[in-house]
């Protein structure tokens, strides 16, 4: 009896040890990570069997439902960052997660698992949409530390394919209002080879989302929002469904205000200082005028470095040009003042002819009143005063001692709007002419230049900022 009990005990001990070995064999235990890595063999075997079965007769060269109906691609994009934007190259950089979802009936499977989450090694084994970005100059997929790709397959054949891309996309900037301009930079994509009869793109709900803008590199722009569109583009190869996202950007003026606008305004104001300098200080006024003109030329060159070589006039070009004209006009004002106010020394001219000769006056009137001294002393060597002829309340001088560079009075009406001496203000001026005293030109400029520049700024800023 004791021998039978001992035999039964040995038998049960052997069965228990065997069952324990079987349980240990049903799980894989990594030697280096025994505490947290446990993968049942049966599940690995199921996934491997499912994939082998799906790919056994799968042809990745053919799109799903070929010859039956078009393949529908649902698209959504997550914008990781935007920027910088290059105005010179007319392009911008964008970092996105690009996700495409479609259904491939050839990849349906029956299993207790609903989703197969796979890595990038499976991407090359199934059909993938041939999506291209139509306005990209360069594009780069991220491969560190592994290819940034995600592939998921549902048991009903739905496939999700996601990858991370950095794209330098073209953005045609219209710089007429620069630097107060706003732009809608597009990101356009479509199929490379499948027309709309074979492939259709659709936006998913909440298809475009953006990350926190704190990490964006929009140094000179503010992000105002985005919008997406769908259109059909006709080409010689067929009609294609084209998807576009527009990123609304508005330029910040702070940089250009500091670098261009404020220096230009201060240079114009500096050129007005010459109006308060005496007109006899020719070196000081000339140096100041030439310096301000050269400064405006330098500022104009610097302002153009931030722009491509466009053929039209931008808002900044207009402002810099007008400022240059104001500075140049201030220099020309002194040149005009100096020219008309510089008189020669008085000269004494004797008339060798008498009033009896026809050449003694400009012309011979019908009634002449001659006024001259009646008696002269033989010892008085002073020249006689000039002879004056009076006709119909008009005064004509036979001789004029103060002869200026510009001769206004010589029997002719003044041909200029400027007076170079006091007698010009008398009847020798043509009636209806504007009388401007050249000696008061600085006084006029002190009012005219600031007023006109203030009016220009008022029209400029209101027109570009609010109209």
From Swiss-Prot:
PANTHER family: NEUROTRANSMITTER GATED ION CHANNEL. Its main location: membrane. Glycans are attached at residues 110, 228. This is Gamma-aminobutyric acid receptor subunit gamma-3. The chain crosses the membrane at residues 257-277, 284-303, 312-332, 447-467. GO terms for molecular function: chloride channel activity; GABA-A receptor activity; GABA-gated chloride ion channel activity; transmitter-gated monoatomic ion channel activity involved in regulation of postsynaptic membrane potential. Keywords: Cell membrane, Chloride, Chloride channel, Disulfide bond, Glycoprotein, Ion channel, Ion transport, Lipoprotein, Membrane, Palmitate, Postsynaptic cell membrane, Signal, Synapse, Transmembrane, Transmembrane helix, Transport. InterPro entries: GABAA/Glycine_rcpt, GABBAg3_rcpt, GABRG-1/4, Neur_chan_lig-bd, Neur_chan_lig-bd_sf, Neur_channel, Neuro-gated_channel_TM_sf, Neuro_actylchol_rec. Heteropentamer, formed by a combination of alpha (GABRA1-6), beta (GABRB1-3), gamma (GABRG1-3), delta (GABRD), epsilon (GABRE), rho (GABRR1-3), pi (GABRP) and theta (GABRQ) chains, each subunit exhibiting distinct physiological and pharmacological properties. GO terms for biological process: chloride transmembrane transport; gamma-aminobutyric acid signaling pathway; inhibitory synapse assembly; response to xenobiotic stimulus; synaptic transmission, GABAergic. Disulfide bonds join 171-185. Residues 1-17 form the signal peptide. Residues 18-256, 304-311 are extracellular. May be palmitoylated. Expressed in brain. Gamma subunit of the heteropentameric ligand-gated chloride channel gated by gamma-aminobutyric acid (GABA), a major inhibitory neurotransmitter in the brain. GABA-gated chloride channels, also named GABA(A) receptors (GABAAR), consist of five subunits arranged around a central pore and contain GABA active binding site(s) located at the alpha and beta subunit interface(s). When activated by GABA, GABAARs selectively allow the flow of chloride across the cell membrane down their electrochemical gradient. Allosterically potentiated by alphaxalone. Allosterically inhibited by pregnenolone sulfate. Inhibited by zinc and lanthanum. SUPFAM superfamilies: Neurotransmitter-gated ion-channel transmembrane pore (SSF90112), Nicotinic receptor ligand binding domain-like (SSF63712). GO terms for cellular component: chloride channel complex; dendrite membrane; GABA-A receptor complex; GABA-ergic synapse; microtubule cytoskeleton; nucleolus; postsynapse; postsynaptic membrane. PROSITE patterns: NEUROTR_ION_CHANNEL.
């Amino acid at each position: 009896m004791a021998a039978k009990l001992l035999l039964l005990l040995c038998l049960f001990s052997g069965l228990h040890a065997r069952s324990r070995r079987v349980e240990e064999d049903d799980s894989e235990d990594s030697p280096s990570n025994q505490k947290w890595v446990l993968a049942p063999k049966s599940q690995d075997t199921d996934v491997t069997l499912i994939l082998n079965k799906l790919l056994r007769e799968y042809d990745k060269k053919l799109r799903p439902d070929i010859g039956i109906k078009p393949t529908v691609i649902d698209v959504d994009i997550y914008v990781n960052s935007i920027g910088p934007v290059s105005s010179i190259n007319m392009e911008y950089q964008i970092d996105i997660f690009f996700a495409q979802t479609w259904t491939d009936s050839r990849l349906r499977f029956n299993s207790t698992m609903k989703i197969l989450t796979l890595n990038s090694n499976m991407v090359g084994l199934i059909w993938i949409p041939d999506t291209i970005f139509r306005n990209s100059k360069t594009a780069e997929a991220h491969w560190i530390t592994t290819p940034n790709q995600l592939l998921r397959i549902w048991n009903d054949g739905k496939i999700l394919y996601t990858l991370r891309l950095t794209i330098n996309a073209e953005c045609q900037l219209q710089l007429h209002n620069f630097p107060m301009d706003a732009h809608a930079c597009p990101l356009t994509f479509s199929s490379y080879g499948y027309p709309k009869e074979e492939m259709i793109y659709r936006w998913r709900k909440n298809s475009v989302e953006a990350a926190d803008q704190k990490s964006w590199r929009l140094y000179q722009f503010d992000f105002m929002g985005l919008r997406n569109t769908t259109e059909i583009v006709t080409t010689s190869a067929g009609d294609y469904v084209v998807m576009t996202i527009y990123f609304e950007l508005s330029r910040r003026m702070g940089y250009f205000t500091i670098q261009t606008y404020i220096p230009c305004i201060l240079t114009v104001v500096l050129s007005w200082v010459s109006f308060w300098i005496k007109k006899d200080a020719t070196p000081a006024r000339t140096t100041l005028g030439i310096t301000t003109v050269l400064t405006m030329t330098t500022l104009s060159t610097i302002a153009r470095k931030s722009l491509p070589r466009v053929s039209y006039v931008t808002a900044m070009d207009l402002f810099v040009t007008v400022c240059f004209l104001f500075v140049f006009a201030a220099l020309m004002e002194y040149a005009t003042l100096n020219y008309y106010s510089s008189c020669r020394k008085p000269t004494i001219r004797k008339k060798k002819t008498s009033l009896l000769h026809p050449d003694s006056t400009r012309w011979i009137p019908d009634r002449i009143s001659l006024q001259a001294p009646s008696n002269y002393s033989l010892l008085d060597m002073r020249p006689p005063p000039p002879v004056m002829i009076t006709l119909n309340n008009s005064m004509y001088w036979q001789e004029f001692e103060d002869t200026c560079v510009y001769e206004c009075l010589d029997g002719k009406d003044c041909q200029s709007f400027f007076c170079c001496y006091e007698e010009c203000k008398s009847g020798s001026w043509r009636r209806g002419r504007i009388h401007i005293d050249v000696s008061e030109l600085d006084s006029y400029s002190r009012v005219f230049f600031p007023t006109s520049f203030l009016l220009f700024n008022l029209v400029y800023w209101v027109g570009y900022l609010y109209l």
